């Protein structure tokens, strides 16, 4: 826990080298401090529960269904994507999925995974790319879910 005179109203938590650092205003009461510490410890535990092995297993299943098991890739949840649901680095075939999607329905997660897998084949949102993504029977529904939840900022997703 780190108290700061500059910090007036906000509380911040960071994980650095697997340690949780909580930044608090210096004028915060002990009761409020305890409440925030409990809240941030719970937040950290939730972050730990993101299961990359289950994500990889599901991505491999979708690779078999939609890409005939031809893609080689890595995939993991990340906590630093606030404006995207997923991203793909075409060059090293690395997929990152926002931890925000861990709370979304499975069919929405599947849509985002398929979308990112398709970027391994087509790095842009070309017609061929969209043909692949739209093979997913819940593609339109998932896009609607992301829009309705205010999560989707890019209409091309």
Label every PLM stretch briefly.
Residues 1-111, 120-157:
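Active-site-proximal or metal-binding-adjacent scaffold patches in catalytic folds
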Residues 116:
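Walker B catalytic acidic pair
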């Amino acid at each position: 826990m780190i108290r700061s005179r500059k910090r007036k109203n906000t509380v911040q938590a960071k994980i650095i080298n697997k340690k949780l650092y909580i930044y608090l205003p210096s004028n915060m009461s002990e009761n409020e401090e305890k409440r925030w510490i409990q809240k941030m410890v719970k937040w950290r535990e939730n972050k730990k529960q993101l299961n990359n092995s289950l994500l990889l297993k599901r991505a491999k299943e979708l690779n078999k269904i939609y890409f005939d098991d031809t893609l080689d890739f890595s995939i993991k949840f990340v906590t630093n994507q606030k404006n995207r649901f997923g991203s793909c680095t075409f060059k090293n075939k690395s997929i990152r999925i926002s931890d925000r999607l861990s709370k979304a329905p499975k069919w929405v997660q599947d849509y985002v995974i398929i979308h990112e897998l398709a970027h391994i084949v087509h790095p842009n949102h070309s017609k061929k790319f969209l043909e692949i993504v739209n093979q997913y029977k819940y593609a339109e529904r998932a896009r609607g879910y992301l829009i309705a939840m205010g999560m989707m900022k890019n209409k091309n997703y």
